């Protein structure tokens, strides 16, 4: 596998694209490094996964800027436009022919009334959730990020910064549902070296503004981004990453993302259940199979709260996320139905106009 994650499966997709194109034309593999209005930056590779920017006039390892012209077969595709992390096929003329099937896809839910999901990135292996423990780590925010990671198909890892001021036992509790939990100083090369040893593939770094994401990314890559200060009054940082960008390390790629102020729940209720695996396990002992863990008799989850085996606040956060997810799903279904109705109405109108046109011709 190359430094960008190119492997034989991506190569097979490109071979199929070349066969479909015909005429002996070559299809270059490329990974979206950044997205701009009307254009993208693409890191091109050859058939072995080695950098191949020279094919389009860029130094190897440097991205090529490509204008976004929607291919005809992508007009109605749900995968268009490309997002950071996408693998694409590029022809010799420098046009994107297609977006290769995504293995994982991370989206951020809307926090407004509209049930919209904002694409973040694709084909990631690990969602690195960065959360400072000073002044206090937000369990709710961590859980929401973990649920988003599960929904995307990637693995959630938690990195706790400024952790020297916290109780180690408390830190492990914060990482329920995460594959890895690490406490470190984002500015310490020695601390980050422990993380680097574990990383491979593509990692996306997420967290609130001021969490230390850019500092961590800088240390991971040995690069320099603009790192903002954190206000002492409220411990909140200035946004230092204004857009998503994929950058390559020695044996992994990193996607840094802007900080978030508020985070909605995913619509994927299974992903939420995976995040709260302890509650899901308890629920199997509830008297009713469809127990809502409210006022039903024989609720094993409520009994666990009463005995102190389960934190009541954790249950409330779970119920709140599930309720939010159901509301979003309902709004999304309603929007889809309205869109389908509008499309059907337009098709009916076109059909009536065509019928009238043909009738007019026949009369003539």
What are these regions (language model features)?
Residues 1-18:
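A general sequence property marking short-to-moderate contiguous segments
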Residues 3-6, 23-26, 45, 52, ...:
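Helix-rich effector regions associated with P-loop NTPase G domains
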Residues 26-36:
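Structural detector for short beta-strands of small beta-barrel domains
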Residues 38-42:
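Short aromatic-glycine-enriched beta-strand elements
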Residues 120-123, 129-178, 182:
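Phosphate-binding glycine-rich loops and their immediate beta-loop-alpha structural context
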Residues 164-211:
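Canonical P-loop GTPase G-domain recognition
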Residues 214:
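Walker A/P-loop
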């Amino acid at each position: 596998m190359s430094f960008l994650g190119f492997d034989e499966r991506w190569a097979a997709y490109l071979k199929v694209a070349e066969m479909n194109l015909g005429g002996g034309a070559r299809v270059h593999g490329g990974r979206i490094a950044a997205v701009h209005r009307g254009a993208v930056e693409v890191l091109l590779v050859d058939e072995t996964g080695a950098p191949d920017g020279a094919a389009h006039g860029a130094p190897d390892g440097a991205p090529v800027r490509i204008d976004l012209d929607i291919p005809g077969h992508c007009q109605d595709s749900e995968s268009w436009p490309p997002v950071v992390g996408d693998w694409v096929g590029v022809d010799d003329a420098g046009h994107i022919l297609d977006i290769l099937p995504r293995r994982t896809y991370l989206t951020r839910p809307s926090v407004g009334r509209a049930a919209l999901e904002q694409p973040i990135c694709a084909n990631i292996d690990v969602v690195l959730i960065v959360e400072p423990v000073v002044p206090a780590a937000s369990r709710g925010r961590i859980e929401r990020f973990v649920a988003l990671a599960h929904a995307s198909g990637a693995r959630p890892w938690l990195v706790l910064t400024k952790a020297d001021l916290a109780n180690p036992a408390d830190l492990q509790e914060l990482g329920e549902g995460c594959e890895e939990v690490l406490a470190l100083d984002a500015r310490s090369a020695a601390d980050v070296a422990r993380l680097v040893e574990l990383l491979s593939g593509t990692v996306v770094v997420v967290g609130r503004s001021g969490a230390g994401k850019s500092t961590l990314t800088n240390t991971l890559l040995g690069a320099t981004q603009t790192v903002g200060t954190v206000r002492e009054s409220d411990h909140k940082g200035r946004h230092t990453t204004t857009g998503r960008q994929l950058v390559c390390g020695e044996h992994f790629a990193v996607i840094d993302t802007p900080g978030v102020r508020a985070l909605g729940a995913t619509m994927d209720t299974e992903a939420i259940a995976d995040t709260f695996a302890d509650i899901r396990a308890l629920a199997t002992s509830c008297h009713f199979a469809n127990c809502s863990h409210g006022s039903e008799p024989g609720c094993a989850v409520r009994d666990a709260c009463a005995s102190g085996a389960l934190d009541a606040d954790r249950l409330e956060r779970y119920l709140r996320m599930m309720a939010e997810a159901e509301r979003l799903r309902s709004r999304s279904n309603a929007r889809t139905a309205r869109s389908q109705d509008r499309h059907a109405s337009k098709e009916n109108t076109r059909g009536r106009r065509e019928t009238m046109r043909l009738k007019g011709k026949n009369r003539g």
